[in-house]
From Swiss-Prot:
One of its GO terms (cellular component) is cytoplasm. Homodimer. This is Aspartate--tRNA ligase. The keyword Transmembrane helix does not apply. Catalyzes the attachment of L-aspartate to tRNA(Asp) in a two-step reaction: L-aspartate is first activated by ATP to form Asp-AMP and then transferred to the acceptor end of tRNA(Asp).
Length: 586
């Protein structure tokens, strides 16, 4: 029988009626109606129905074919009597004249047609079978289309697709490194890159001006539903473009994606909020603007002079909502417990009915004009940063409980003017501290990374804790899908940043000596960003789990169930690397 395809399944239409075709694929479903067999043949393009009549000399053999067996068939395209409008090939079927089994399948550990209903452990262990499900396969096909759209936008803007190293050097970039021991240099280690940050800056110093790549990144950090230990990002760096120009280029990428993937228009420019505005309005630096709730300052409506001492400590802020019917007493108690347990704040709630405020603190409200009948108001008071953070989390919870998020909309915005430093950071690599500088209470940490350019050098020198950074994060429906900054192109400024972060001269030379030296030989103004490819695909495919859009993801505990990795290695391999294994696992 002819061994080449004549068509992919989804290419076949009524226009092919009467033609002989040669197809290959998996037997997806089958139905035996006594004198007629129906099969669904699945290939990468889609599904087509096969018809086998009783007079076919292979009828008895074909009737015994197991699901997921790989076959090639010869047949004639005929018009389907009972058409299926849900299939691209629903107007036709293939009258099979010959079938050849290429690989017979044994009984499968999961139902490919309904693999999404299987346990996640089973799906991940047999991921290659899970990926046969057309809905699951669609995620990765969309990933391809999204990647290609981004690539085409960058290529038309004169970017070069260049690679960077995988075996790199351990540098503090915000998480723990995955280390690779060197056989040739015992006791020394490579690190898998957390990002190509330093390499892409070196590309700019080398004069390439516009770089991008689909980069693999590795971070040994705690996992979440939208995070994996290895992930992909669209990594971009440019010379001579300012912040507005880089943000505009990024918007062009997203606008093209909406047009190519969803066939939807998207207006520019995107909304911009400063980091401070985002926290004051939404209690988050990645707010979901489909949620209509905004933090409101209600202080002026209260008579705080008559309140008990310590009832309010600062401004009184919160939300008001109109969906009071679904808020039970139990739910209100749950909200109060959330604030007291996690933030040591007291939540007050009150409602307006028949033009009268009802609630425990109604006596302290001097002006109730801010509240309409049947509206409920939630307020707290406390330290600004803690209060805003608490209200931000509560905002998300309240919107979920009351179904306030408009899921028919897409909300994109930029967050800009981040602080350059933060003063607390847990579980991250730290510089060595000398005895003279051993007090960690006022330690500074880079909010993004130590190569970010400050907005104002004078403030950086006089009051570094107040310094802002030339950074910009792209937020979509509450997810950070990209972020970047302008970089430092002055060696003195870079050394000042390292000093403020507590790195000694020896540490700087050991970890970043190559960069500091490179900055001395003429460095163009440059900046860039990275778009999280996995998160973009997750949002474009409307799934809530990032594992769905990664071909071979790991579990929440960073295990690969299919490969059974990580795994032990034999003693000979350790001896070759001159390593001795010591574990205090309890």
């Amino acid at each position: 029988m002819k061994t080449k395809y004549s068509h992919y399944n989804n290419q076949l239409q009524l226009a092919h009626q009467g033609k002989t075709v040669f197809l290959k694929g998996f037997i997806f479903r089958k139905r035996n109606l006594g004198k007629t067999l129906f099969f669904d043949l699945r290939d990468v393009s889609g599904i087509v129905q096969l018809l086998v009549k009783e007079n076919n000399p292979q009828y008895d053999k074909i009737a015994l074919i197991k699901l997921e067996t790989v076959v090639q068939i010869k047949g004639q395209v005929i018009e389907r009597i009972n058409k299926n409008p849900d299939l691209p090939t629903g107007d036709i079927e293939i009258l099979v004249s010959h079938i050849e089994i290429l690989s017979e399948a044994q009984t499968l550990p999961l139902n490919v047609f309904q693999s999404q209903e299987s346990l996640e452990e089973t799906r991940l262990k047999y991921r290659y079978l899970d990926l046969r499900n057309p809905e699951v396969k669609h995620f990765l096909i969309q990933r391809h289309h999204i990647t290609q759209s981004i690539r085409q936008t960058l290529l038309k803007n004169d970017f070069l697709e260049l690679e960077t190293l995988i075996l790199s050097k351990s540098t503090p970039e915000g998480a723990r490194d995955y280390l690779v021991p060197s056989r040739i240099y015992p006791g020394n280690f490579y690190a898998l890159p957390q990002s190509p940050q330093l390499f892409k800056q070196l590309y700019m110093i080398a004069g390439f001006e516009r770089y991008f790549q689909v980069a693999r990144c590795f971070r040994d950090e705690d996992l979440r539903s939208d995070r994996q230990p290895e992930f992909s990002q669209i990594d971009i760096e440019t010379s001579f473009l300012n912040q507005d120009e880089i943000m505009s280029l990024t918007e062009e990428i997203i606008v093209d994606l909406f047009a190519n993937i969803w066939k939807k228009p998207l207006s520019q420019p995107f909304l911009r909020l400063t980091y401070q505005q985002a926290f004051e309005l939404y209690g988050s630096d990645k707010p979901d603007l489909r949620n209509p709730l905004k933090i409101t300052d209600f202080t002026t409506f209260f008579d705080t002079t008559t309140c008990p001492q310590n009832m309010f400590s600062g401004n009184i802020k919160g939300f008001k909502v109109s969906k009071t019917a679904v808020l039970t007493r139990r739910k209100l108690d749950e909200y109060q417990l959330f604030f007291s347990k996690h933030f040591n704040l007291k939540l007050f709630s009150f409602v307006k009915k028949n033009d009268k405020i009802i609630g425990g603190i109604s006596q302290f409200i001097k002006d109730d004009s801010f509240l309409k009948n049947e509206e409920i108001c939630f307020v707290v008071s406390g330290t600004k940063d803690i209060m805003h953070k608490a209200l931000g989390i509560f905002r998300t919870k309240l919107a979920l409980d009351l179904s306030l998020v408009d899921t028919t909309q897409e909300a994109l915005l930029w967050i800009v003017d981040f602080p350059l430093f933060e003063t607390t950071q847990e579980d991250l690599p730290q510089p060595d501290l000398t005895l003279e500088n051993s007090n960690t209470s006022n330690r500074l940490y880079s909010l993004h990374h130590p190569f970010t350019a400050p907005c104002d050098i004078a403030i950086l020198k006089s009051n570094p804790q107040k310094a802002l950074a030339k950074t910009y994060d792209l937020v979509w429906n509450g997810y950070e899908v990209g972020g970047g900054s302008l970089r430092i192109n002055n060696p003195q400024t870079q050394e000042l940043i390292f000093s403020l972060l507590g790195f000694s001269q020896e540490e700087v030379q050991t970890r970043f000596g190559f960069l500091v030296e490179a900055l001395k030989y003429g460095t163009p103004p440059h900046g860039g960003l990275a778009l999280g490819l996995d998160r973009l695909v997750m949002l474009f495919t409307k799934t809530n789990n990032i594992k769905d859009v990664i071909a071979f993801p790991k579990t929440q505990s960073a295990k690969d169930l299919m490969l059974e990795a990580p795994s032990a290695v034999d003693q000979e391999q350790l001896n070759t690397l001159k390593l001795k294994f010591k574990c205090n696992c309890n």
